[in-house]
């Protein structure tokens, strides 16, 4: 290796020249990413490296090469690669892909990853408008996650997604009483009426309910448990079945005895077409998976009947959660029953139950005064 004033040149057996130097900042030897067929080009590379160090703008040659290559990678190309390589459930991957296809690629898809800036992100965010706030927020979260990975890959120095999003308004929904639930359920098509009671009293998610099969029911005649392992969701025009939403979502849920009796009767009378272990617990009259649209249609009639047309399917989860809290379930017990990973929602139901308890006490006192 020929010694020089700065850096080294080594002639290889092939006759080509390899250039390298020791960076005084970290004491590490760095090599040119290519060899040269003449000394002049090799020395020019060394001179350029020395100049970067003196100007304090030096970064490792490998990082610069990676960034240069990335300058040709568009956001769409990088995002598609990200979706393939990311450890995501199939349903989540399809969901993220849908947000990217509809809201990210049409506007930002041709922009190079290295050219993504906060100004571009702000313009894209504003251009989506406010008509669909949830979809807008989800698309932004996908873009932010992709850009976080670009930072980790050292393609960009910092994430350009810096918009402060307001948390979605949390709906405070008063849970149905058992009497109101009966009125609502009476309006639901009889073949899948049991769905309302299961959702309400076991606090399952709708996607978990429609993927429940006979093999997921453990029943010794005294105690019934539902083994929640999977969930189904509609992504575009197809139903995607995957593992439950989170690790904690995989759980056994004990069914209140009065609902267990309903389920036993339902299995005897309503699932005659298929009694195998893979048979869905709740189906259409044709034995197919219950759709959200079909269930919602009759559920809305029930909600209107009790003067609560604003309620949604998901609000049925609050029934079982609230009454479990009133029955004395601890935060940890509620988290386990609901399949939550954080205590926030469980504590919300506990607070609701405490508020209800105070109202009951007030009503009791009024009775005493009138007696």
Swiss-Prot record:
Lineage top rank: taxon: Viruses
UniProt keyword Acyltransferase, yes or no: no
Keywords: DNA integration, DNA recombination, DNA-binding, Hydrolase, Transferase, Viral genome integration, Virus entry into host cell
Core-binding (CB) domain boundaries: 73-151
Domain Tyr recombinase: 171-362
Catalytic residues, chain numbering: 205, 245, 314, 317, 340, 349
GO biological process: DNA recombination; symbiont entry into host cell; viral genome integration into host DNA
InterPro entries: CB, DNA_brk_join_enz, Integrase-like_cat_sf, Integrase_catalytic, Integrase_recombinase_N, Tyrosine_recombinase_XerCD
PROSITE patterns: CB, TYR_RECOMBINASE
One function term, GO molecular function aspect: DNA binding
EC numbers on record: 2.7.7.-, 3.1.-.-
Function according to Swiss-Prot or TrEMBL: Integrase is necessary for integration of the phage into the host genome by site-specific recombination. In the presence of host integration host factor (mIHF) forms a specific intasome complex with attP. The intasome subsequently binds attB and forms integration products. mIHF probably stabilizes a sharp bend in the DNA during integration.
Similarity comment: family membership: Belongs to the 'phage' integrase family.
Subunit structure: Forms a complex with host mIHF and attP DNA (phage attachment site). The complex binds attB (bacterial attachment site) to form products.
Protein name in UniProt: Integrase
Organism per entry: Mycobacterium phage L5 (Mycobacteriophage L5)
């Amino acid at each position: 290796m020929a010694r020089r004033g700065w850096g080294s040149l080594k002639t290889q057996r092939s006759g080509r020249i390899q250039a390298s130097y020791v960076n005084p900042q970290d004491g590490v030897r760095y090599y040119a990413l290519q060899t040269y067929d003449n000394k002049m080009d090799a020395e020019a590379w060394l001179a350029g490296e020395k100049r970067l160090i003196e100007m304090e703008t030096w970064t490792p040659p490998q990082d610069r090469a990676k960034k240069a290559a990335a300058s040709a990678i568009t956001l769409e190309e990088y995002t598609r690669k990200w979706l393939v390589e990311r450890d995501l459930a199939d349903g989540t991957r399809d969901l993220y892909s849908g947000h990217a296809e509809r809201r990210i690629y049409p506007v930002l898809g041709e922009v190079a990853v290295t050219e993504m800036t906060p100004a571009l992100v702000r313009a894209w965010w504003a251009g989506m408008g406010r008509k669909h706030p949830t979809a807008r927020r989800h698309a932004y979260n996908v873009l932010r996650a992709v850009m976080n990975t670009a930072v980790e890959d050292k393609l960009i120095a910092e994430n350009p997604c810096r918009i402060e999003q307001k948390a979605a308004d949390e709906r405070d929904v008063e849970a149905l009483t058992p009497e109101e639930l009966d009125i609502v359920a009476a309006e639901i098509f009889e073949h899948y009426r049991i769905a309302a009671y299961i959702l309400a009293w076991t606090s399952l998610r709708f996607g978990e309910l429609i993927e429940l099969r006979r093999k997921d029911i453990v029943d010794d005649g005294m105690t019934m448990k539902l083994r929640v392992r999977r969930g189904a969701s509609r992504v575009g025009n197809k139903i995607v079945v995957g593992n439950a939403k989170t690790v904690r979502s995989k759980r056994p849920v004990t069914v209140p005895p009065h609902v267990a009796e309903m389920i036993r009767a339902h299995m005897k009378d309503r699932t005659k077409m298929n009694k195998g272990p893979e048979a869905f617990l709740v189906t259409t009259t044709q034995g197919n998976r219950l759709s959200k649209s079909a269930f919602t249609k009759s559920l809305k009639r029930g909600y209107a009947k009790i003067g609560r047309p604003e309620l949604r399917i998901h609000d049925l989860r609050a029934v079982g959660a609230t009454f479990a809290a009133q029955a004395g379930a601890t935060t940890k017990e509620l988290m386990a029953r609901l399949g939550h990973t954080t205590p926030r929602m469980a504590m919300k139901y506990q607070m609701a139950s405490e508020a209800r308890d105070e109202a009951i006490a007030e009503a009791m006192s009024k009775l005493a005064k009138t007696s």
